[in-house]
Amino acid sequence: MTHPDQKPWILGLTGGIGSGKSAAAQCFIDLGIDTVDADHAARWVVEPGRPALEQIATHFGNGVLQASGALDRGALRKLIFENPEQRRWLEALLHPLINQEIVSHLAKAKSPYAILVSPLLIESGQSRMVQRLLVIDVPQQVQIERTMLRDSSSQEQVEAILKVQIQREDRLRHADDVLVNDRDHAWLNSEVERLHHFYLTLRGGQS
């Protein structure tokens, strides 16, 4: 990890599906903190006209493209979900490109610290970009219930996703800070504000 005086100082924010990463990130944004979402970077690198999209279509066939030429994420997700080897191929293509996008956007941060939000922060090696790691955590049953409600998914579908994500215990082992997000939004907001002031202290009290 780099020294806290280095600019920009980056906080990594991660958590499993249904943990409330996006809600926590929004609380930081409301406090004026610049945030880069790895999921957004992942969408940018496969936009029409980008080289990665052409490589994906060549590898998987035009069945992964919509009529407009945009990526059909559902079709691609189905292909890689059923084939770990194909998923690894896709990750090897996209992860370096996604990381380049992330680094470029983080370098533009103007706030006292910046946040990288990523569901794959640990698995992808993106944790090497950050100085501190915050895990948003909830019990697994809460993850399942929230995701079923949000995505209209079955319990079996959510459990299948959980199986391919890093185990909760492993994620927590990497954490510098843990925010257990199993209460209401007002409580989440107060916890984020508490952590925000702590991170400002780590940055030497800049505001």
From Swiss-Prot:
Entry GO CC: cytoplasm
Lineage: Bacteria, Pseudomonadati, Pseudomonadota, Gammaproteobacteria, Pseudomonadales
Residues holding ATP: G18, S19, G20, K21, S22, A23
Superkingdom of source: Bacteria
Transmembrane segments: none
SUPFAM superfamilies: P-loop containing nucleoside triphosphate hydrolases
Key words of the record: ATP-binding, Coenzyme A biosynthesis, Cytoplasm, Kinase, Nucleotide-binding, Transferase
Entry protein name: Dephospho-CoA kinase
The organism of origin for this protein: Pseudomonas syringae pv. tomato (strain ATCC BAA-871 / DC3000)
Oxidoreductase in keyword set: no
The keyword Transferase is assigned to this record: yes
Involved pathway(s): Cofactor biosynthesis; coenzyme A biosynthesis; CoA from (R)-pantothenate: step 5/5
A GO BP annotation: coenzyme A biosynthetic process
Enzyme's top EC category: transferase
Domain DPCK intervals: 10-207
NCBIfam families, per the entry: dephospho-CoA kinase
UniProt record similarity statement: Belongs to the CoaE family.
E.C. code: 2.7.1.24
Main location: cytoplasm
Subcellular localization(s) per the UniProt record: Cytoplasm
